């Protein structure tokens, strides 16, 4: 009897030791998993929280578009967007640079409580590439200098682009491509005496152009309405309806004559 009791006690002790061993292994495995998860998770979280550069000049990246503009040079005067960003910028490069190119690069520049892009007098900005300039409740562009738009999608809930000619300076704009959407597409800055010279050579325009912009010239483009456009048309162009989308295209007018032609035989006179 004693022998059986001893064997039973030994089995209980063995089972207890085995259970403790299994439990200890489980505890160790649990904390190992937690440790590994933390090692993998927290660096990823830290990486995700780190601010990323939004613009590039040459081979150098910057945390803001404005900072990138300030680091342009005669050799590298193109600022390329690297991601969507919310920032209102002013074209103020270093003193030796009089103009820059903003390459949208498929990204969006969203206004931040002010006009999205301001071009001061005696500065030049060229906008290229696909992407967006979003004014929101502010204009997309205020220009007192020179502006060239060669691509992009521009939107605003108010006047989209504003220009100015004052006693000492005059804006100059040339738009050859892009999509432009706003209640009012073009207007004057508050202190402007005149619009300044602006020419539209191409692009798609959804919105109104007001009357009285005496130095606006329309040479091309597609417009959602013909209202007020006729006085701005360049010589020898007209508005042609596009039946597919309800737009009106500016095209060169063909010259034709209603007078019959008369063929003269050799030696004959009229």
Where are the regions a protein language model picked out?
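N-terminal secretory signal peptides that target proteins for export/translocation
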Residues: 1-21
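N-terminal extracellular ligand-recognition/capping segment immediately after the signal peptide
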Residues: 76-115
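Acidic Gly/Asp/Thr-rich repetitive segments characteristic of extracellular carbohydrate-active
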Residues: 51-80, 86, 254-270
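Sec-dependent signal peptide cleavage junction
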Residues: 37-53
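Hydrophobic core
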Residues: 28-40
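Surface-exposed loop/turn motifs in large extracellular/passenger domains
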Residues: 91-103, 118-134, 142-157, 163-183, ...
């Amino acid at each position: 009897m004693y022998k059986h009791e001893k064997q039973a006690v030994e089995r209980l002790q063995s089972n207890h030791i085995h259970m403790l061993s299994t439990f200890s292994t489980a505890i160790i495995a649990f904390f190992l998993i937690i440790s590994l998860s933390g090692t993998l998770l927290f660096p990823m979280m830290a990486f995700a929280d780190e601010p990323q550069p939004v613009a590039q000049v040459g081979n150098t990246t910057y945390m803001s578009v404005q900072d990138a503009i300030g680091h342009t040079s005669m050799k590298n005067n193109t600022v390329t967007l690297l991601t969507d960003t919310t920032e209102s910028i002013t074209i103020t490069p270093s003193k030796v640079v009089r103009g820059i190119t903003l390459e949208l690069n498929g990204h969006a520049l969203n206004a931040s409580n002010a006009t999205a892009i301001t071009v001061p007098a005696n500065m030049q900005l060229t906008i290229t590439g696909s992407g967006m300039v979003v004014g929101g409740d502010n204009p997309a562009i205020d220009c007192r200098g020179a502006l060239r738009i060669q691509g992009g999608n521009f939107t605003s809930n108010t006047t989209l682009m504003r220009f100015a000619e004052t006693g000492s300076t005059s804006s100059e704009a040339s738009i050859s491509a892009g999509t432009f959407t706003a209640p009012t597409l073009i207007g004057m800055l508050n202190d402007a005496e005149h619009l300044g010279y602006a020419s539209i050579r191409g692009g798609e325009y959804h919105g109104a152009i007001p009357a009285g912009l005496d130095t606006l010239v329309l040479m091309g483009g597609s417009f959602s309405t013909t209202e007020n456009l006729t006085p701005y048309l360049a010589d020898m162009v007209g508005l042609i309806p596009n039946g597919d989308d309800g737009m009106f295209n500016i095209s060169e007018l063909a010259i034709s004559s209603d007078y019959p032609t008369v063929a003269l035989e050799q030696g004959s006179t009229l």
